[in-house]
């Protein structure tokens, strides 16, 4: 079996030469007469340039086919092979990686499993982020959770910046919030997921994740790119961690934002996350608060859903843009809002209600023009943010 990788080069770069350099340098490392007696042995490890196409802007995309026998069925050895030291060679960007279906680690729960845990099958999920990100006590987290959970929220997560800090230690947050989740379940029959941020040193992370689950965590959050894909793979393949893992994109810009260097967002937040075991992946929405290419967003969405992974467009999601989100995503999406819920003029519970009002109006085919909206949470949100 093989792995296909697309590299994009600017007009000033000799794409043919660079593609051949990658095919040899990122596999056998050398291919000269001095090693002719080993050619048969080395041949099976060599990559092959299978095509080069020129785009309208003069850029060229070279396609290279790598033997799968060169890697260990994980993301770390894959990234080392396809881009490794070549990532320091100058202009050239990985814009597509095509892996066998069986490659890597599959989501343990994904879209279908998360919906089953929540008992919600016929609509997008609504998710919030604890805000302010830092400075809240464990009890503050529980008080906020109570407000939004009883308003109908499906999922809430720690802010990715919230580590295991003295102001609100992770197990204290979980303990306080777990009691609220049980209240909600007993009084409403609904389950709400709380994705607890897993942080720490490499030798502690899996133990800490297992302990969180043992103590009642029903979802986990992981900053995959700062802790490493290997951590995600380890958590996702651990039978003791039977809860969904929400993958955060923090640090992705350092790998992906360069126009002619690094890897495309769709490769890192789409392909790699989907083959490393994430159940849901957060990433910027093109219509949100961070600049993001709509084409890349669409690729990420499709790559994730092809592997049963929940897409979670984020950063600047607010009730007034729900029609745009659903137009692009349909119902299999998680609407993730931080300030779009927590900073609602009438409070976080109204922020949650505004999203559900938006979903109801879309279902009924009704206008979002403020002049046609009844007084309530949605109208307030649209007047506040558009």
Curated annotation (Swiss-Prot):
Substrate binds at residues 131, 157-160, 248, 316, 338-339. It comes from the Bacteria. The active site is at 85 (proton acceptor). Binds 1 Mg(2+) ion per subunit. The keyword Iron does not apply. Its EC number is 5.3.2.5. The modification N6-carboxylysine is found at residue 157. It is an enzyme of class 5 (isomerase). Pathway: Amino-acid biosynthesis; L-methionine biosynthesis via salvage pathway; L-methionine from S-methyl-5-thio-alpha-D-ribose 1-phosphate: step 3/6. GO terms for biological process: carbon fixation; L-methionine salvage from methylthioadenosine. Mg(2+) binds at residues 157, 159-160. InterPro entries: Diketo-Methiopentyl-P_enolase, RuBisCO, RuBisCO_lsu_C, RuBisCO_lsu_C_sf, RuBisCO_lsu_fd_N, RuBisCO_lsu_N_sf. Its cofactor is Mg(2+). Keywords: Amino-acid biosynthesis, Isomerase, Magnesium, Metal-binding, Methionine biosynthesis. The keyword Acetylation does not apply. It catalyses: 5-methylsulfanyl-2,3-dioxopentyl phosphate = 2-hydroxy-5-methylsulfanyl-3-oxopent-1-enyl phosphate. Homodimer. Has no RuBP-carboxylation activity. Belongs to the RuBisCO large chain family. Type IV subfamily. This is 2,3-diketo-5-methylthiopentyl-1-phosphate enolase. It comes from Microcystis aeruginosa. The gene is mtnW.
